[in-house]
Amino acid sequence: MTNSEQNPPSEENVQVASTGEIESNYDEIVECFEALNLEGDLLRGIFAYGFEKPSAIQQRGIKPILDGYDTIGQAQSGTGKTATFVIAALQKIDYSLNACQVLLLAPTRELAQQIQKVALALGDYCELRCHACVGGTSVRDDMNKLKSGVHMVVGTPGRVFDMLDKGYLRVDNLKLFILDEADEMLSRGFKVQIHDIFKKLPQDVQVALFSATMPNEILHLTTQFMRDPKRILVKQEELTLEGIRQFYVGVEKDEWKMDTLIDLYETLTIVQAIIYCNTRRRVDQLTKQMRERDFTCSSMHGDMDQKDREVIMRQFRSGSSRVLITTDLLARGIDVQQVSLVINYDLPVSPETYIHRIGRSGRFGKKGVSINFVTDDDIVCLRDIERHYNTQIEEMPMGITDILQ
């Protein structure tokens, strides 16, 4: 829990199996929310949000944070991971103190803003003040909001560090520092920013990390800023492919994918679907081709203006747009309950991204279907994904319509 410059961590902090998985050292299970001794207003917010009983990660992950332990939680996207750390954070806040007590980092603006919405909903009866500090929004708004006082800040590394560095985000009263999607946050792109932020935090701050995947090399990085963490593991091959039917369609050549997608539209009644492409250019190209053939669809990627992206997400969540073509910008943590189908128009470059993509199609045990377009050049990549998750992806059957119903 202490700043590593003051107390160098030992190698015992994170146990890593030869498979690259963390070894769980915490097995206490809490069967119901009432048994966590939560404040009445927080419990009321949890039930009002629609939760009835905690999911597997919530049964294991909330209590160690409440008890003050640094915590590493590994669980699949869509299992209630966000609510795990949000519920714990809301319980630790002193609402009479008008100061930031929880700082939470996420890798993307969309994920940070979604976490803020979950926190405000769960903390509705607690009168929670939670602000999202993300790039692409007004710096002046951040300054004014932080100056007026908030209990919790959710943000992306660049903007959060900026607010810390300029003194607008004060962390004198910080109790809990959370990183969501820890694998992404600690990867090469964010590692330096995370360390710069951590150096500015109180020495005794409690740290929690949650993610669907935690590669071996990432776990070793956690020794630099965690002390004797409680480790909670959902084994990689159990990470969720349960409830999600996975298929592939052989398309031989890349240029045949478009016709294959059209064929699928003609045979499937799709309630709501996400189509993933590997590049922004590819998203634009596919969207243009679909619209030229009179198929209604939306598209979103990182080159778009932040406000435009928010409008597109609102339309998709409301159901006014039923097909969304996107890059991996959307793959981590976007909660769209109605999605019944995910199509990987392009197989992901990294096997670890696969679970984030198809996790959108079966949230909280809701059944979903994932269809992967596989060219001859993609066969090796498909086999890598199967090995990585210890799963088998079958060829799409003729009766796919029955499976979706």
Swiss-Prot record:
Please give the Gene3D superfamilies that the UniProt record associates with this protein: P-loop containing nucleotide triphosphate hydrolases
Quaternary structure and partners: eIF4F is a multi-subunit complex, the composition of which varies with external and internal environmental conditions. It is composed of at least EIF4A, EIF4E and EIF4G.
Gene name on record?
EIF4-A
Q: One Pfam annotation, family name?
A: DEAD
Q: What is its EC number?
A: 3.6.4.13
Any idea which UniProt keywords this protein has?
ATP-binding, Helicase, Hydrolase, Initiation factor, Nucleotide-binding, Protein biosynthesis, RNA-binding
What protein family is recorded? Belongs to the DEAD box helicase family. eIF4A subfamily.
Tell me the organism. Cryptosporidium parvum
**Catalysed reactions, semicolon-separated:** ATP + H2O = ADP + phosphate + H(+)
Enumerate the residues binding ATP. A75, Q76, S77, G78, T79, G80, K81, T82
Q: Where is this motif: Q motif?
A: 31-59
Occurrences of domain Helicase C-terminal (ranges): 243-404
Recorded hits in InterPro entries, A to Z, give:
DEAD/DEAH_box_helicase_dom, EIF4A_DEADc, Helicase_ATP-bd, Helicase_C-like, P-loop_NTPase, RNA-helicase_DEAD-box_CS, RNA_helicase_DEAD_Q_motif
Function as written in the Swiss-Prot or TrEMBL entry: ATP-dependent RNA helicase which is a subunit of the eIF4F complex involved in cap recognition and is required for mRNA binding to ribosome. In the current model of translation initiation, eIF4A unwinds RNA secondary structures in the 5'-UTR of mRNAs which is necessary to allow efficient binding of the small ribosomal subunit, and subsequent scanning for the initiator codon.
GO molecular function terms attached to this record: ATP binding; ATP hydrolysis activity; RNA binding; RNA helicase activity; translation initiation factor activity
- Helicase ATP-binding domain mapped to chain residues: 62-232
Motif DEAD box at which residues?
Answer: 180-183
Please identify the protein, giving its name as recorded: Eukaryotic initiation factor 4A
